[in-house]
């Protein structure tokens, strides 16, 4: 082997290891810049010496020419579907069937449990460790050849990370698109007047079935393996869970939520846990997949028609249903945004009865081609506000009415305008508009802003309707007599509200900035502004160039902040708030180079009292930490607030350093 070949082999091996650490272990050992440097070095060498180019090189993910169509591939081992369970009773019946069928029933059945990913099932064949072929599930017997497209997925290894690869290994898994990538893809499509995707599953399907792999390479797809088909020249582990861990060890990504559960009760607990964290996973799932862990028992149980007896999918309640659109109301938000809200025939979706859904804006009404009286597809995912994602136009009745977007505010009758380049139409009434005033005040008292407990939305509405308050500063001028005259406001409730208002006067600069409700300034941006400028006066006096030096503050956000401080009314409100006693301590945050959390993995759990979860996360990231959502042996610190639960228990079990909120704040300030 020549020196060039040795150099190429070493570069490829190093890059494969870095890809494995980044995509499979989620624990990169080098910065992206180092990977990029080696990648470009490898690419340059391969261009100089094309005779040594190999198909499994990290540089060869993209490059195939567009196809005229997909050829078909017959699965040597059929890719079967799963039977479903929709209730605890149906799952228990599944377990009972297993127990009745087994000749020698073990003392306790162990299940390998995993989230049911909402993507596309694929088969990937490795021959002597090199990715050779990939196919869709198709009808279970015949699928489509998507080899060129699968090669573009960054977390799919082109060569297995083992010196002793199987002669043939078929990996089966699910390809899906995480929420963050889906949002980026649709945002790009909107900006370039391209068609958007309705949901991440459609986006993943459309991306995998692109005839041009160069397009697929730009789509943020991810693979999670869930099983093995063909396996030749290798002694596989004897349990399903161990096989998945073996796949992970040779570079194949598996889902981090996979768990072993002993007995039906633990499985049902897993189902509930996954359902509870569903909205925070960052990708779509529609249930759990529950498999007998012991391969020998799987073989004994066998199959029925097109499904295994040893596995089932326990599905979540439906997230999409059909219903009728009865009417549309137009609501006014804190910044004057006019939002059309669909009034629906009540329908049970994902565990709750839904009667309202957002239609977002006029563009969405036009895109959906929706009318009052239509049959619509309603979707509710986790805590997300229900939304209409489709219309059955073929069911449109003759008496359907068009939706007409108003030209004047439905609350104050001010003119509605739409600024060029923005999708949102806005009322021009400002604080003259009672609806905007109410929402601005509700934001001001909210938990992540001034956190004024005892002053809720209904109280704000009464105060505004009776013309008792007009600005946030007016809240601090309320007295016992005024409050006790309101509906459902006894002396005790009024005293509690006044005490909360008094306590809220002592806050942080970041919370105060966020509470002001400056457009585009969220919790994290407010924290960055506070850390950068240190004082309110410095922020107020900053010019556009200085504002854009703050992390995550671009031209648009800087302009919003700059204009806010140039409006005399806003300055007067802020000065009035200070005059009413609102104050904060000046806290300087340590630089990233001198703090405990630089390059460490940190998990937040429980309720923090001094700042919101997003605030703390942004602060840690600013200090150079990686903030993770789950505790593992790779975790360096757990910051535990009030009512910390299972994450704290796991940290203690793994002897991971646990810090209270006070200890955390002491470490990051000086």
Swiss-Prot record:
Report if keyword Disulfide bond is assigned.
Answer: no
Reactions catalysed, semicolon-separated, are: NAD(+) + (deoxyribonucleotide)n-3'-hydroxyl + 5'-phospho-(deoxyribonucleotide)m = (deoxyribonucleotide)n+m + AMP + beta-nicotinamide D-nucleotide
The entry marks the following residues as binding NAD(+), namely 32-36, 81-82, 114, 137, 174, 291, 315
Q: Which residues form the BRCT domain?
A: 592-670
Task: Tell me which residues this entry annotates as catalytic.
Answer: 116
In the record, biological process GO terms are: DNA repair; DNA replication
InterPro entries, per database record: BRCT_dom, BRCT_dom_sf, DisA/LigA_HHH, DNA_ligase, DNA_ligase_AS, DNA_ligase_CS, DNAligase_adenylation, DNAligase_N
The membrane-spanning stretches of this chain are: none
The Swiss-Prot or TrEMBL record lists the needed cofactor(s) as:
Mg(2+); Mn(2+)
Give the CDD domains listed for this entry: BRCT_DNA_ligase_like (cd17748), LIGANc (cd00114)
| Cellular component GO terms, alphabetical | cytosol
**Described function:** DNA ligase that catalyzes the formation of phosphodiester linkages between 5'-phosphoryl and 3'-hydroxyl groups in double-stranded DNA using NAD as a coenzyme and as the energy source for the reaction. It is essential for DNA replication and repair of damaged DNA.
Q: Which family does it belong to?
A: Belongs to the NAD-dependent DNA ligase family. LigA subfamily.
State the protein's name: DNA ligase
Organism field: Haemophilus influenzae (strain PittEE)
Gene responsible for this protein: ligA
